[in-house]
């Protein structure tokens, strides 16, 4: 058994699935891609999607959340499918109407933001959309949000686990009850591992464990165990594999996208004059908000638009997620290591061994 993380997956040859920052390149042969689609189709079928459903997929089609792959999996299972991308709630509303959608695949914060805009901007009753099923993917969410979405839309709220390496939908659950474990569509796809050592856990009540992939269906990585960076909390009465509640390692999850912290550190290290920086992540409203707080080492840089622009461009080069850059008003005379300040309480840190 070979233990890997996303950073150490061999690049291989043929078609490569790239992350948005191109820091992860996973080989997917034609057979692997077909297996990814078939696994996802089986998962959606197990979650209750049938030929009577008309599905809109409001996800990105690159990297972490492969909306195009999930749409392909739904095609032939549902009566109709459409992929519209994640941006533009008014456009999404128009797409739901045009398709006559009964099911929507979206991130939890995307669904919450759509709901807020329906009430405050569009003056549309969510019940009038006629959605029977909300399929939430790609983010850590809570039972209260899922129950609120279910009540407002009058719909089933299903959580589908899409793995961050291959982009396959592997498991599902009723998301309105946090006690409901993930139900993998096949045996042997998911497992739990110790955070500090390469060992699969049979049971570990009262501990945290990392969700790992065992992609037996993959042509070249079938004997690997791949760490996902997603962490579950195991209570004394945990049954099966719970939904992830935290992240760990060198990637942090923001708006359903994985940000590579080593890449961010590397590009900011090339900008002369940065003494220290903090990446602050919040979820005060419906969406994640990320702010990079930068302290410069020289007074001349505090109001230098060119230097501020360099920081913004560096951040934009490593992630499609919008990250606001805030220059602190005072000079920092001492350098300090970068800080990840996750106010959501999701990210446990880069060091697995310290957990």
What do these predicted regions represent?
Residues 72-82, 102:
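A short helix-loop-beta submotif of the ANL/AMP-binding
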Residues 84-355:
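Active-site glycine/GP-rich loop and adjacent strand/helix microenvironment
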Residues 1-35, 39:
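Active-site diphosphate/adenylate-binding microenvironment
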Residues 26-28, 52-59, 92-93, 100-103:
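Short acidic, glycine/Ser/Thr-rich loop/turn "cap" segments at secondary-structure junctions
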Residues 32-35, 80-84:
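Short, flexible loop segments at the rims of nucleotide/cofactor-binding pockets, characterized by
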Residues 14-15, 57, 106, 136:
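Redox-cofactor binding/interface segments in oxidoreductases and associated redox assembly factors
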Residues 38-73:
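Conserved AMP-binding loop of ANL adenylate-forming enzymes
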